[in-house]
From Swiss-Prot:
Pathway: Carbohydrate degradation; 2-deoxy-D-ribose 1-phosphate degradation; D-glyceraldehyde 3-phosphate and acetaldehyde from 2-deoxy-alpha-D-ribose 1-phosphate: step 1/2
Catalytic activity: 2-deoxy-alpha-D-ribose 1-phosphate = 2-deoxy-D-ribose 5-phosphate; alpha-D-ribose 1-phosphate = D-ribose 5-phosphate
Binding-site positions, Mn(2+) 2: D303, H308, H356
Family annotation (Gene3D superfamilies): Alkaline Phosphatase, subunit A (3.40.720.10), Phosphopentomutase (3.30.70.1250)
Organism: Bradyrhizobium sp. (strain ORS 278)
One GO BP annotation of this record: 5-phosphoribose 1-diphosphate biosynthetic process
Descriptive protein name: Phosphopentomutase
Record's cofactor remark: Binds 2 manganese ions.
Keywords of the record: Cytoplasm, Isomerase, Manganese, Metal-binding
HAMAP family: Phosphopentomut
Annotated residues for binding of Mn(2+) 1: D9, D344, H345
Family: Belongs to the phosphopentomutase family.
Amino acid sequence: MRALIVVMDSVGIGGAPDAAGYGDEGADTVGHIAEACAAGQADSDQRQGPLQLPHLAALGLGEACEHATGRRPPGLQQKAGAGAAFGCASERSRGKDTPSGHWEIAGVPVPFEWGYFPKTVPAFPPDLIDQLCASAGLTGILGNRHASGTDIISDLGEAHLQTGQPICYTSADSVFQIAAHEEAFGLDRLYRLCEATRPLVDRFNIGRVIARPFVGRSASGFRRTANRRDYAVPPPEPTILDLATAERRHVVTIGKIADIFAHRGTGHNLKGDSNDTLFTRMLEGLDALDDGGLLFANFIDFDTLYGHRRDVAGYASALEAFDARLPELLDALRDDDLLVITADHGCDPSWSGSDHTRERVPVLIVNGRSAGSIGARTSFADTGATIAQHLQLPPTRHGNSFWPNGA
C-alpha cells in the first residue's frame, strides 16, 4: 500500500471561480491547447493534428475538464475507463504560484498573502540591493525589473559576462531570481549568492529565491541549464511529507519537490533535466518505494519551457509525450497503491503575458477500488487528506478525503 502524487506543472483546466480577480477569466490551459490543435494551429515538426491524450482521457481528463468549465475540449471526448476516478479542484490559497499550489496539494493552504515586487524599474528597493552587494562583494547588479527569464538572459547575458554582475529580476510570482553564467560567474558562487539573498528578502515575505544558471557565449547562444535551484521558505504547518516522515515512512521526491518544500520531509530526492528523464527517475523511485511509502513528483517542462514561453505547439507535444509514457507508470502500480495526477496552477500558453493563470486543476485517481466522479473540490488540500487516509497517517488539518468513509 503506497501513495503517489504526480504534479503536471501548470496543466490547468480553466474555470476557477475567482479567475476574474487575477485577470484570468477565461484562461484554460488544456482547453485552449486542445482547441488550437483541432484548428491546425499547433502543428510542428514534433506533432500534428488534434490533441492525442488517450491515456489521460481514459483516466478521466475529459470529464475533469467538463467539471471545471462545463465543456469537453476537442480531442478529449473519449469517456473515462471503468476504473477511473476523476474530478477537478479549486485553489484556496491566494497565490497562483508553485509553493502555494504544491503546499496546498500536500495539505497546507497558504494562510497569508505573499509579498511581490512592483512592476517598476527598478523593481527592488535600493537598500535591498545595497545589502545584497555588500554581503556578496558585488559591484552591482543587472536587470532589476520584471522579465521573462529567457528574454533577460538574451538581453543582458553579454553585459553580465563583461561586468561580472549577476542578473536579478522578478515576475508576477513572489520570487527574486538571479541568473548567472555557470562558468564565468561559477555555479557554486551563484548558489552561495542565492543562499545569502534568502534571508534578505524575508522581510518582504518573498516565497522563493531562484538560481537560474545559464551557458553560452553570446545572445544568440545563451541557454538555461538544468541546475536551477529554488530557495523557498518552509511551509507554515506540517505537510503530508512531514506526516509521512514522522511516521518513519519511505519518502521519495522527484524533480523540484524537495526545493519547493525547503527540503523538509522530502526524503530521497531524484532529479532530471527533462520531463522524460524525470519520468524515468519516477519509475526508479517507485520500484524502490517501500510499502506504506509516499512518492511526490513534479514535471516542470510544461510550465517553464512552454507555458511561460507561450508555446502552444510545444506544450501540446509535451502533453502527448507524457501521455505516451503513462502506461509504464500504471503497469508499475500495485493493486493497493493510490495514484493522484493533478496540477498546481495554470499557465495558459494562449494567454497574454508570460505569467501563471488562475485555473482549476484536474484530479485523476487510480486506486484499484473506487471509481467515478469526485466532483468539483473546493481545495487542493483534499488530495493531501486522501493520501493521509490511504497511508493511515494522522489526518491533515485541512482538506477532506475524496472518500470520507474510505475507498
